[in-house]
Amino acid sequence: MTNRSELRRRFRKLRRALPPDTRAANADSIVRHYFRSGLGLRNKRIGAYLSRRDGQDGEVDLTLLLERLVSLGKQIAVPVIRRHGSMEFYAYDPDQPLLDNRFNIPEPHLLARHVTGISRDLILAPLVAFDDSGVRLGMGGGYYDRYLGSICPMLRPLIVGIAHETQRSPTPLPFDAWDIRLDAVITEAGWQPFR
């Protein structure tokens, strides 16, 4: 079995290799699939992520989706990585300045409103790779697994991965007891529930 570091390298290379116009077209398709799935109507309080401003890592940029959700009156929160290694969600306001963290990922200022885990209906999670059973391979920091693991499973929000189809692993990914599976994924190919 390939180790996680090798898998991360391989799948990050694949998403970085996508031309910018392909990434933009994929992001547009993901917005359409998000609303076709019914998620746009059912969920008012949404945890999402912000991508590096330079776009160098090839992650799906959610800017268009977040703008549309805010215009529909949805409450958006995005992660802030704390110095001690934890992740918390803070209210996102597109009109407020964002500060880049040590990973060059924009975050709201810590004076923004803190949002507790159980107050989210849905979390849109970034990922490096996923498989057809909902296993998510992240960047390796464990932030999302620790954050989601701290929420009682009965109160846990719906967890939807956002990815390019090229990030789909044709073989099962490694999975540990503390890993949290995705409930679904959205790629440019569509919405795929796992449960």
Describe these PLM feature segments.
Residues 1-118:
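N-terminal active-site beta-alpha-beta segment that forms phosphate/nucleotide-binding
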Residues 58, 132-141:
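Glycine/threonine-rich flexible loop motifs
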Residues 52, 129, 191:
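Flexible, active-site-proximal loop/turn residues at the rims of small-molecule/cofactor binding pockets
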Residues 1-9, 13-17, 109-114, 118-123, ...:
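Surface-exposed, charge/polar-rich loops and edge strands
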Residues 64-71, 139-151:
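A short, gly/pro- and small-residue-rich
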Residues 46, 123-124:
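Receiver (REC) domain switch-region micro-motif
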Residues 93-95, 137-144, 176:
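Short, surface-exposed, charged loop/turn segments at secondary-structure junctions
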